[in-house]
């Protein structure tokens, strides 16, 4: 297929050459030669199976050129005849001459074309053979070149791989050395930092230790000072409460003795009056034994009732005073306990001492109150002989004495002091009120 196409191209080249030769002939003919216009036309080639051979194509091209030339000559003659009637003969003669010249030229062109076609054929064959040889040689060279390039590329690749391998090994060794160096530097840096942190920590620990010791000493001194203050204050309060309680107990004792003396004198006087009345009226009493007995009994009952009322009033007042004194004593005990607990919180070593002192003070207060109670009880208790006579008089009709019964109740510590204080307030004797318990402590604060 490629050879047929090449043949067609060569035929076209030959036709062009023939047309060029004809054009040259027309130019060299001079003024008398009629110019012929050769129109080149591309001929469509039939399908490959209907194509003629190379020679046939050449002859067909020559024949076409001849026909074109003839048509041109005939056309020119016809135009000349129509243009001017005068040059018709000349045009006919010229046309005949041109026709003969054209035929001759066509034959020459055919011979020349055949010769050229032969030359072109040989040239084409030579060129094809040469191209074939060149192609084979080029293919061989290309194969050799490719093989050389492949070998060269292989060698170059191997060389590059070796270079890369060496480069990688060098880089690995360099990285290893650099890593080891960095690790060593890091280890040294870490050791330095650890040592520095250790030194700094030791320094801080020493500072904190000294600071803690100083604070502990300050706290100890402060606690000891506060404990001493609390101890002194507790002792001072305990002494005040003790003195106040003793003073009140003494006052209560005196007042109680005075009151009991008055009651005793009143009872004795009443008894004397009754005895005098009974002795002076013996005769009358004998005559009016029953009346006298009833009167004496009534008088005794009245005296006993008065005495009971007085004692009941004193008992009620004593109960109130007892409650008030108990509240005061409890308040004093609570203050003592609070002071003791405060001293215990500030200084543990002084807790036991403060508690012991508080308990001693408390025991002293309650002991003093107990002694006062016993004294009052002993004063209020009637002698045993009077008790026996009174019992015998009740059983056998009388002993000639007027018996006054005094009911004595056992009271708790502090009741008497409270009762006496309430009695003083009822009778207007408020001049012995000492006022607030902590006034003296406030005035004397800082003297100890």
Swiss-Prot record:
UniProt cross-references to Gene3D superfamilies, sorted A to Z: 6.10.140.1430
Organism, scientific name: Arabidopsis thaliana (Mouse-ear cress)
Any matching Pfam family: LEA_4
Gene symbol of the encoding locus: ECP63
Coiled coil: 297-331
Induction: By abscisic acid (ABA) in immature siliques.
Reported tissue expression: Expressed in mature seeds.
Region of interest (Disordered), ranges: 282-360, 411-448
Record's keyword annotation contains Coiled coil: yes
UniProt keyword Transcription, yes or no: no
Composition bias type Polar residues, residue spans: 420-432
Keywords annotated in UniProt: Coiled coil
Full protein name: Late embryogenesis abundant protein ECP63
Biased composition (Basic and acidic residues): 282-326, 334-354, 435-448
Disulfide feature: none
Similarity-based family: Belongs to the LEA type 4 family.
Stated role: May be involved in the BHLH109-mediated regulation of somatic embryogenesis.
GO cellular component: cytosol
């Amino acid at each position: 297929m490629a050879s047929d196409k090449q043949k067609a191209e060569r035929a076209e080249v030959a036709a062009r050459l023939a047309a060029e030769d004809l054009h040259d002939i027309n130019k060299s003919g001079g003024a008398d030669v009629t110019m012929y216009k050769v129109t080149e036309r591309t001929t469509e080639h039939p399908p490959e199976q209907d194509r003629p051979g190379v020679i046939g194509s050449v002859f067909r091209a020559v024949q076409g050129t001849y026909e074109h030339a003839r048509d041109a000559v005939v056309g020119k003659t016809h135009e000349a005849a129509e243009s001017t009637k005068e040059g018709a003969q000349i045009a006919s003669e010229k046309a005949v001459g041109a026709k003969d010249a054209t035929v001759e030229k066509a034959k020459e062109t055919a011979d020349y074309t055949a010769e050229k076609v032969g030359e072109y054929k040989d040239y084409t064959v030579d060129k094809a053979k040469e191209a074939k040889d060149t192609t084979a040689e080029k293919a061989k060279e290309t194969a050799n070149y490719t093989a050389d390039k492949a070998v060269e590329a292989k060698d170059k690749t191997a060389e590059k791989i070796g270079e890369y391998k060496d480069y990688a090994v060098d880089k690995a060794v360099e990285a290893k050395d650099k890593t080891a160096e960095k690790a060593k530097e890091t280890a040294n840096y870490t050791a330095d930092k650890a040592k520095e942190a250790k030194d700094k920590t030791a320094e801080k620990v020493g500072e904190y230790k000294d600071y803690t010791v100083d604070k502990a000493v300050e706290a100890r001194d402060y606690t000891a000072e506060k404990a001493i203050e609390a101890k002194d204050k507790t002792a001072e309060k305990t002494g005040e409460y003790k003195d106040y309680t003793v003073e009140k107990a003494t006052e209560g004792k005196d007042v109680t003795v005075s009151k009991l003396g008055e009651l005793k004198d009143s009872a004795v006087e009443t008894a004397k009056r009754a005895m005098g009345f009974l002795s002076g009226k013996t005769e009358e009493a004998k005559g009016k034994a029953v009346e006298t007995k009833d009167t004496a009994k009534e008088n005794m009952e009245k005296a006993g009732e008065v005495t009971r009322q007085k004692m009941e009033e004193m008992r009620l007042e004593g109960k109130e005073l007892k409650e008030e004194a108990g509240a005061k004593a409890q308040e004093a005990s609570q203050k003592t306990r609070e002071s003791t607990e405060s001293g215990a919180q500030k200084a543990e070593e002084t807790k036991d001492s403060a508690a012991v002192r508080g308990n001693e003070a408390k025991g002293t207060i309650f002991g003093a109150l107990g002694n006062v109670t016993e004294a009052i009880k002993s004063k209020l208790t009637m002698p045993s002989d009077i008790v026996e006579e009174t019992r015998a008089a009740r059983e056998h009709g009388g002993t000639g004495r007027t018996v006054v019964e005094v009911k004595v109740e056992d009271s708790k510590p502090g009741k008497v002091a409270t009762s006496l204080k309430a009695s003083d307030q009822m009778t207007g004797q408020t001049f012995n009120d000492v006022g607030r318990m902590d006034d003296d402590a406030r005035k004397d604060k800082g003297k100890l």
